[in-house]
């Protein structure tokens, strides 16, 4: 199995948490990214349906800077087998290992072309938590490369004083 598409998917995941607080230095130590799940259904033959990889059951991404867990994660591929979008569903939690931020959502979609992470409400609002604030909204849109956040729908911010 060609692991290049899966490695590209891990880039998406690493950008999720990077959006919360920029790293002062890139991950120069290399390190290993491990994606585990109970099952993986990978289809790169477009004649047999959409080109995608579907991770199901206790999905966990462990990367030097963060961890992500969800119940399911789908990686969608373009004609050239590059990753177009990644979608994590059900109890999506992303935590930086340095403890500076985390996100919680029922659905998270990362668009590779737009470099945009969207946290979506299914039945409850997603939230993005940093050391001094928590943001809740029907939709939270993060742009990792621009250190920018937008919200849509009902939104609120809770500010906490630093200890």
Language-model features: locations:
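Mature-chain termini and adjacent capping regions
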Residues: 1-163
């Amino acid at each position: 199995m060609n692991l290049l598409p899966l490695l590209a998917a891990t880039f998406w995941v690493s950008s999720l948490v990077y959006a919360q607080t920029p790293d002062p230095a890139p991950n120069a130590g290399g390190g290993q990214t491990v994606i585990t799940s109970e099952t993986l259904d990978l289809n790169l033959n477009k004649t047999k349906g959409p080109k995608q990889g579907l991770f199901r059951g206790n999905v966990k991404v462990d990367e030097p800077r963060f961890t992500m867990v969800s119940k399911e994660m789908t990686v969608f591929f373009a004609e050239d087998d590059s990753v177009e979008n990644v979608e994590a569903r059900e109890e999506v939690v992303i935590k930086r290992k340095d403890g500076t931020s985390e996100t919680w959502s029922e659905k998270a979609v990362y668009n590779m072309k737009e470099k945009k992470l969207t946290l979506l409400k299914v039945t409850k609002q997603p939230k993005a938590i940093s050391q001094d604030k928590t943001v809740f909204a029907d939709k939270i849109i993060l742009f990792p490369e621009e250190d920018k956040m937008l919200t849509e729908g009902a939104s609120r911010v809770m500010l906490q004083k630093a200890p």
